[in-house]
Amino acid sequence: MGQSGLLQGTPMALKSTIYKAVLDISDIDHGHYSQHSLTLACHPSETEERMMVRLVAYGLNAHTVHTVCQGNASLSFGAGLSDPDDPDLRLADYTGRTRLWIEVGQPDERALTRASSRADRVCVYAFSPSADVWWSLIEPKLSRQSKLELWRLPSDDTRRLCTLAARSMSLQATLQEG
């Protein structure tokens, strides 16, 4: 049998699409002003909308490197959809302790309970039209999770984020009274 016969039936793994973003943040509420050069891997099963919500979550939490960890930490993108045990974003201090675990979308109860056991604080950024229904079903099961915060982003706004998505992006965000 030739070499091509060995490869028959072997599925080809799809690769993530790489996006580069320069994000200028002016967080007036926290006195945080910075520029971040970021690389985002968009998993083949991830939508651009979800990827852009991850970028928004980064911008909303960039100040935590200084306000929570006095600069002794890093906020980074996790494996996300590629690894269900890894957050979409993680703030880890230099001892390796996870100070903030960020999920995007509608994670299940088990994932949020596991995240709460591994991090000081867990934030979920829900954005789809079905997020309210998802939360009404999952909230009673998570009533003991004091570390958990839910942020509901309007789906009309998150869909508009897709118009900004490009393989190379330069974005500015001003945060005030948020």
Write out the residue ranges for each language-model feature.
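Conserved catalytic cores of phosphodiester-cleaving nucleases, focusing on short active-site segments
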Residues: L89-L91, G96-L112
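Short hydrophobic alpha-helical runs that function as membrane-insertion/retention elements
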Residues: W101-E103, R121-A126, E149-W151
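A short acidic, amphipathic alpha-helical/loop segment
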Residues: A111-A115, L137-I138
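Extreme N-terminal leader/targeting regions
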Residues: G2-R50
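Nucleic-acid nuclease catalytic cores
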Residues: C123-I138
